[in-house]
Regions:
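Post-Walker A alpha-helix
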Residues: 143-144
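Short histidine-centered catalytic/ligand-binding loop motif
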Residues: 84-94
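Glycine-rich, often acidic-flanked micro-motifs
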Residues: 1-25, 34-41, 121, 125-135, ...
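Long, basic/Gly/Ser/Thr-rich N-terminal segments
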Residues: 1-86, 269
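Short solvent-exposed loop/turn micro-motifs enriched in small/polar/acidic residues
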Residues: 68, 114-116, 155
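Generic beta-strand structural signal
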Residues: 73, 82-84, 114, 119-121, ...
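N-terminal pre-Walker A segment at the start of P-loop NTPase domains
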Residues: 97-117
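Conserved glycine(s) of the Walker
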Residues: 138-140
Length: 269
């Protein structure tokens, strides 16, 4: 049994494994609550005779077929019905297919779920989520350690989801992570800070367009290798539009911070 954090997405996903003779649960993806309608379905089909793989190779899904150790597999989507179909030959490792199907589903259904993924430390302060954005080595883990020392809850040190509900934006734990005490909740974003290591802690104003351009690479890198080359520009455009909307509604600043200081005392929001 495999469990994933999906409460934070505000949706439920059903993941089932079918071998054409019976249906068994391959993974348990936490529903929002009992009786919640399934928002997305991921169906994994094992084909012992390879007939499905061969049939799909002759259709428009041919480019979806991938060769891996143990055989072939393919994944495609029915956006209208919110379903993912993944077919694989019997010797392909089921865990690999599950992981692939989940990741491809999050990529394919980002518009449906109205979410993006972001490389950022997410910290809860006064029941609001504050995001701290920086490239690799820019201080996300450091600011998270300082937050823990100051008694704040850290949603995640490296990555999180951003979900839009109406005109409000929320942050939660990245869903394909081990279960934690933050897995069943999302927090409204109270502010976004762009980290800059310095010899002095202070906040500075930043233009909205600068905030967007600093954020796009930290979001577009998610699933970048999964996106077909012909769709990469559209993928980045969608992220740009989402972030532009977010920074019209969410407080943001540049944060110069000194590692050994109480950096949280200088936050201005």
């Amino acid at each position: 049994m495999v469990e994933f954090n999906l409460e934070s997405l505000g949706v439920s996903i059903n993941l089932s494994f079918q071998n054409f003779k019976n249906d068994t649960l391959a993974g348990s993806l936490i529903p929002l609550k009992k009786g919640t309608k399934t928002d997305l379905s991921i169906l994994l089909y094992e084909d012992k005779k390879k007939t499905v793989i061969q049939k799909i190779k002759k259709t428009e899904f041919k480019n979806c077929v991938k060769k891996v150790r143990g055989g072939s597999y393919c994944t495609f989507f029915d956006i209208d019905k919110r379903k993912t179909f993944s077919f694989f030959e019997k010797d392909v490792f089921l865990g690999f297919v599950m992981d692939h199907a989940l990741n491809r589903s999050f990529l394919a259904f980002q518009n449906v779920l109205d979410i993006i993924f972001l490389h950022a430390a997410a910290i809860v302060i006064k029941e609001r989520a504050y995001l701290f954005i920086a490239p690799g080595g820019g201080g996300k883990s450091t600011i998270s350690s300082l937050a823990k020392e100051n008694g704040f809850r850290v949603i995640d040190e490296e990555c999180c989801i951003i979900k839009r509900i109406g005109n409000r934006f929320f942050s939660g734990v990245y869903p394909i992570k081990p279960l934690s005490d933050t897995s069943d909740k999302i927090w409204e974003i109270g502010g976004v800070y762009f980290l800059n290591k310095s010899n002095k802690s202070r906040t500075r104003k930043l233009s909205a367009i600068d905030a967007v351009y600093r954020s796009v690479p930290e979001a577009a890198s998610f699933y970048h290798n999964w996106v077909p080359d012909e769709d990469k520009n559209e993928y980045k455009k969608r992220i740009f539009t989402f972030l532009n909307s977010m920074f019209n509604d969410v407080y943001f600043r540049l944060l110069d911070f000194k590692i050994d200081s109480d950096v949280f005392s200088c936050l201005t929001h």
